[in-house]
Amino acid sequence: FALAHMVNDFEILKSYLDEGANGIESDITFSDEGEPEYTFHGVPCDCRRWCDRSVGIDEYLQHLSDLTTPGNPKFRENLLVVVLDLKLNGLSQDALRQGGLRLADKLAAHYWTGNRKARAYFIISVPKTSESEFMRTFRKELDEINFGDMSAKIGFDFTDNGDFKETQKVYEGLGISEHIWASDGITNCIPLLFRGTDRLEDLTRQRDEPGYKYIDKVYAWTYDKETSVVKALELGVDGVMTNYADFVIKVLNKPEHSSKYRLATYDDNPFEKFTA
């Protein structure tokens, strides 16, 4: 998956889809009470990016629905995965619970819109394991509003770069044992040399352990340099989040990589482990 980073308005969304990105990451902000409000990152953000793009959450989800519904004039076949990077810092546990509930409601009302034909997969990406109540109420609300079948299109991710053994315990407590993405990364402003790839290697090794069910996919963020992308591919990641989707795809298509990997299509389930 070539995951375009910080896609927070329609102009940049079109630009990345034109580059060939098959996934996007968007930042979702919340009120103090936990109401999802709009896409927005703000400063600081990645180097060489404009941090202030924004659109209202309802309008954003409706536009994504148009782009991912076959037969819609706006349909874009290559948009497969939407990572919702949830800006939850500072929210109380009550607000986290409200946030999970309300995001489920908004997906039902503005993305699936009753007919459930919009086909993108969503990754509910929570910053910290201490904010896991968001996931709990999100899942519960989908069932309560009779959208439980859409759980087949929902995955989960914690982005705190923490000890995954502890993360697994949180998933166990939530009753989540499938549709799990794991990630490791650092802002593009800091060279990968300072972050290293030890944890990324650990995640891919854990994913590939026979019978292990708490990691389906591993992705790296935010990789913009060829050396970093090549290293990620050598480690066997399933996705690279980037500010330059066309560049990542170009690297992927080089003969030394294309013999093993290709860009995912809708026939590839993002919640099934890939075996080369």
From Swiss-Prot:
Q: Which InterPro entries match?
A: PLC-like_Pdiesterase_TIM-brl
User: What is its biological role?
Assistant: Dermonecrotic toxins cleave the phosphodiester linkage between the phosphate and headgroup of certain phospholipids (sphingolipid and lysolipid substrates), forming an alcohol (often choline) and a cyclic phosphate. This toxin acts on sphingomyelin (SM). It may also act on ceramide phosphoethanolamine (CPE), lysophosphatidylcholine (LPC) and lysophosphatidylethanolamine (LPE), but not on lysophosphatidylserine (LPS), and lysophosphatidylglycerol (LPG). It acts by transphosphatidylation, releasing exclusively cyclic phosphate products as second products.
UniProt keyword Calcium present: no
Compartment(s) where it occurs, according to its Swiss-Prot or TrEMBL record: Secreted
User: Per UniProt, which keywords does this protein have?
Assistant: Cytolysis, Dermonecrotic toxin, Disulfide bond, Hemolysis, Lipid degradation, Lipid metabolism, Lyase, Magnesium, Metal-binding, Secreted, Toxin
Q: Identify which cofactors the protein needs according to its UniProt entry.
A: Mg(2+)
Protein name, UniProt field: Dermonecrotic toxin LspiSicTox-betaIE4ii
* Binding-site residues for Mg(2+), renumbered to this chain: E25, D27, D85
Give the disulfide map.
C45-C51, C47-C189
Instruction: State the taxonomy lineage.
Output: Eukaryota, Metazoa, Ecdysozoa, Arthropoda, Chelicerata
